[in-house]
Amino acid sequence: MNDYELKVMNTITIETVTRGIIDETSKWDFKTGDYIKLANALLDYSITKPSSSAKNKEIVEILSSVELSFPLTGESVKIKEFDRNTDFDIVNKWLSDEIGRWFLLSRSYHRDTTLTELIDNERNIMGLITLLDSTPIGLMGFLEYDKNHHKAEMRKLIGENEHREKGFAKEATKLWIQYGTNTLGLKKIFLHTIENNIRNVTLNKELGFQVEGILRKECFIDNKYYDLLRMGLIVE
């Protein structure tokens, strides 16, 4: 990446984070003085934050792991190959709630896709996330897997609300990236996320994804336009 590309990426990242912070803090009726305090707190944290070497080591470990096959097994979760006969109903339930429906967001058609359309597409690879006791909690996917160009779009979802924000999404995503890079031979994994979803953006950056651009007013849901942030992981 040259200096110009790095400058553009940094500008996009700063703009994205700023918009996300404004959207979140507006819910708490922040005043000018509150934003000044927030800016000072960010500056203080930037000076004292831990080294990024541990995160870089984590990324290297993900990309250098051995080839995996189903079921993919981690410390707290497993990912098994999606089974239409046993998994369809529970996944379809997840995809009908406010968070789950983003998994079905289509950038290729005038409407959202359906679970049936996703699993009928031979270029889509789906995996069911479970706890170690086989309790289903979420879904991973590689969409439009391109063997010739070694790339695919990644999507993830923790469908059960009580299992969100507990680290399961990160562990499952690491397993899925390992499977994609070391078994499927992917050289690029990309994803799209709502630009003000700071939690998701942070998780993706921790796993090596970099901001590639902002798609302005890319989707229209509940009578509101949303900007999408595109992020990519390149395997050298």
Where do the protein language model's features map onto the residues?
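Short loop/turn motifs at secondary-structure junctions and domain boundaries
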Residues: 118-123, 209
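Short, charge-rich amphipathic interface segments used for partner binding and complex assembly
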Residues: 28-59
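Conserved GNAT-fold acetyl-CoA-binding loop/helix
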Residues: 99-117
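N-terminal acidic leader/helix
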Residues: 2-27
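Hydrophobic alpha-helical core bundles mediating ligand binding, dimerization, or RNAP-core interactions
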Residues: 39, 91-96, 115, 154
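Acyl-donor (CoA/ACP) binding surface of acyl/acetyltransferases
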Residues: 61-78, 82, 88, 126, ...
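Residues in soluble alpha-helical coiled-coils and helical-bundle/repeat scaffolds
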Residues: 26, 30, 163-164
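Short amphipathic alpha-helix that is part of the acyltransferase structural core
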Residues: 77-105
